[in-house]
Amino acid sequence: MNPNQKTITIGSVSLTIATVCFLMQIAILATTVTLHFKQHECDSPASNQVMPCEPIIIERNITEIVYLNNTTIEKEICPEVVEYRNWSKPQCQITGFAPFSKDNSIRLSAGGDIWVTREPYVSCDPGKCYQFALGQGTTLDNKHSNGTIHDRIPHRTLLMNELGVPFHLGTKQVCVAWSSSSCHDGKAWLHVCVTGDDRNATASFIYDGRLVDSIGSWSQNILRTQESECVCINGTCTVVMTDGSASGRADTRILFIKEGKIVHISPLSGSAQHIEECSCYPRYPDVRCICRDNWKGSNRPVIDINMEDYSIDSSYVCSGLVGDTPRNDDSSSNSNCRDPNNERGNPGVKGWAFDNGDDVWMGRTINKESRSGYETFKVIGGWSTPNSKSQVNRQVIVDNNNWSGYSGIFSVEGKSCINRCFYVELIRGRPQETRVWWTSNSIVVFCGTSGTYGTGSWPDGANINFMPI
């Protein structure tokens, strides 16, 4: 091969190699661009579709490093879009209740700065549970705690902490309120906060940390709400509110709220005669509430809320073992499912129950005269059969030698079912314990279990003689 041929051959080989390298670089570049922009293909609508102008909440944004031919490519995983809760799973089948949480607020107040509270409740977002209470604008070891037996003062605020964390000085004050309800729709918290003059109070609706709507008193007689969690289904939340006499005819309305904005108000209908302090739970696709009749009945009213057409029905729990306090002895108490039993209806106490097929699970004070002790049990046929009294699976939560108080329900969504849980308010101080001038509480919390369980009693536990006066 002469020199010219060698030169041509070497040049041809070099050109071929250069061309191959150039094509490889183009391929690598194309791969990089494709992977980088792949994220924009996630759930993208067709070109002829209109994208709704709604906010997207990014829950997490993860970056993965992928190595390809010594070239580093950053691939971003598609963000998850947070959805509204719909509570469509079935209710968990349980055998009873197991201990879940206890905050020991009063015992801790003997040596620390803990808020004076009452009207506690529990509610959960999709990942975590929180405890709420109405603070009195003071800690217990503080002269301002004198006279905190009073319910409605302008200094009361709604407090919010992770469940199990007592209300210390660093606790968030969510809103101004002497009556409240809170719930999470899957995207953000809704707080319903009532405060102001007894004859002209205001309910503020706070969503995602912002005031969105409000409503004034409609009967000029202590506008009030649940003192436990509201319920949201597919982005619409519902809360029961009453304005009017606490021991006579009152005006109860059911409000429907979308991202903090009132979208509909329905009047109470059905056979319930008086409604206070409802304990509500999701019963997909609707919501059910068990309330307090402070006028005519020691059997508890039931409100069924249709979340689609906003219709309302009401009745009473069928169980002849009634849930309110005061009440008749079990042997003489009655309920016909439709009407108040006209047995010691006033004053009453906030409580809860929930249906389980034809049966009903319920909780109540052990003492039929006052707010002491606490028990739970199931009544066979208690949801469907008038005056049913067959009791099973009874548990003592607080023995009858210790004070209890309000109680209410909250729901927790598991992997396969929705569990029902409840809290008990453990009131200390006045009016029962007159050595001190304050009134406050701690809480104990139980949740449904399909397992076995033991026995015990979980009272507040503070020695009143150790407490500040």
From Swiss-Prot:
Residues bearing carbohydrate: 61, 69-70, 86, 146, 200, 234, 402
Transmembrane segments: 7-29
CDD domains named in the record: Influenza_NA (cd15483)
Any one GO biological process: carbohydrate metabolic process
Region (Disordered): 325-349
Topological domain spans for side Virion surface: 30-469
InterPro entries in the cross-refs: Glyco_hydro_34, Sialidase_Influenza_A/B, Sialidase_sf
GO CC term, one of those recorded: membrane
Chain intervals for the UniProt region annotation (Hypervariable stalk region): 36-88
Residue numbers binding Ca(2+): 293, 297, 324
Disulfide bridge map: 92-417, 124-129, 183-230, 232-237, 278-291, 280-289, 318-337, 421-447
Subcellular location per the Swiss-Prot or TrEMBL entry: Virion membrane; Host apical cell membrane
A molecular function (GO) term: exo-alpha-sialidase activity
Membrane side Intravirion: residue ranges: 1-6
Stated regulation of activity: Inhibited by the neuraminidase inhibitors zanamivir (Relenza) and oseltamivir (Tamiflu). These drugs interfere with the release of progeny virus from infected cells and are effective against all influenza strains. Resistance to neuraminidase inhibitors is quite rare.
List of residues binding substrate: 118, 152, 276-277, 292, 371
Catalytic activity: Hydrolysis of alpha-(2->3)-, alpha-(2->6)-, alpha-(2->8)- glycosidic linkages of terminal sialic acid residues in oligosaccharides, glycoproteins, glycolipids, colominic acid and synthetic substrates
Membrane topology annotation: Single-pass type II membrane protein
Ranges in a coiled coil: none
Main location: virion
Keyword Glycoprotein: yes
UniProt region (Involved in apical transport and lipid raft association), positions on chain: 11-33
Family: Belongs to the glycosyl hydrolase 34 family.
Function of the molecule: Catalyzes the removal of terminal sialic acid residues from viral and cellular glycoconjugates. Cleaves off the terminal sialic acids on the glycosylated HA during virus budding to facilitate virus release. Additionally helps virus spread through the circulation by further removing sialic acids from the cell surface. These cleavages prevent self-aggregation and ensure the efficient spread of the progeny virus from cell to cell. Otherwise, infection would be limited to one round of replication.
Miscellaneous comment text of the record: The influenza A genome consist of 8 RNA segments. Genetic variation of hemagglutinin and/or neuraminidase genes results in the emergence of new influenza strains. The mechanism of variation can be the result of point mutations or the result of genetic reassortment between segments of two different strains.
Protein name: Neuraminidase
Native source organism of the sequence: Influenza A virus (strain A/RI/5-/1957 H2N2)
Lineage of origin: Viruses, Riboviria, Orthornavirae, Negarnaviricota, Polyploviricotina
Designated gene of the protein: NA
